[in-house]
């Protein structure tokens, strides 16, 4: 279970220092003469360079430095409350375009596909695949060896505030474009059909479908064969 409860996440966002980080490419003459403040990280040659830092400091430098004749600013957030996760040492496969915020836990050999959005406090178990375009809301908990299908949404706890997160147990398959609402617990080995809207707990080893989702049967051999996961996709 996550160490972050709902109020802790809300407090983290509310009290964090909001940031507008930028990367700026500059050109000019005698750039080595620039008076660069400590808040800005700079890589400079006499006629070109790159600056990294908070926009208010970089903006002030650009406006006050006659040595800079041209510049280009790259920026992808404004007053951001939570930074993105540093993915370099995560023992998982994370494809380009996945957006993962800080304070997310990702288990060994998990797979995060393109376009997935994973919010603060979420946990993803070992060997679980988060498919393309999935949204894991704040503090959503997903167990081991699951598949969360493309476009599925596991609701977060932040707004509206919910004391209990979505909890997906081990070996669960969530079909494409399914929605699991706040506080729902999906039991071990369950299957949620594509497009289902899950508004109440799902017992282990059952299949649910529909809007709202209803139990349609127990998981049997046929279901297990149709929903079997490919472990080779989880190799690193």
UniProtKB/Swiss-Prot annotation:
PROSITE patterns: HEXAPEP_TRANSFERASES (PS00101). Keywords: Acyltransferase, Amino-acid biosynthesis, Diaminopimelate biosynthesis, Lysine biosynthesis, Repeat, Transferase. Pathway: Amino-acid biosynthesis; L-lysine biosynthesis via DAP pathway; LL-2,6-diaminopimelate from (S)-tetrahydrodipicolinate (acetylase route): step 1/3. It catalyses: (S)-2,3,4,5-tetrahydrodipicolinate + acetyl-CoA + H2O = L-2-acetamido-6-oxoheptanedioate + CoA. One of its GO terms (biological process) is lysine biosynthetic process via diaminopimelate. InterPro entries: DapH, DapH_N, Hexapep, Hexapep_transf_CS, Trans_hexapeptide_repeat, Trimer_LpxA-like_sf. It comes from the Bacteria. Its EC number is 2.3.1.89. GO terms for molecular function: tetrahydrodipicolinate N-acetyltransferase activity. Pfam families: DapH_N, Hexapep, Hexapep_2. Gene3D superfamilies: Hexapeptide repeat proteins, Malonyl-CoA ACP transacylase, ACP-binding. Belongs to the transferase hexapeptide repeat family. DapH subfamily. HAMAP family: DapH (MF_01691). Catalyzes the transfer of an acetyl group from acetyl-CoA to tetrahydrodipicolinate. This is 2,3,4,5-tetrahydropyridine-2,6-dicarboxylate N-acetyltransferase. The gene is dapH.
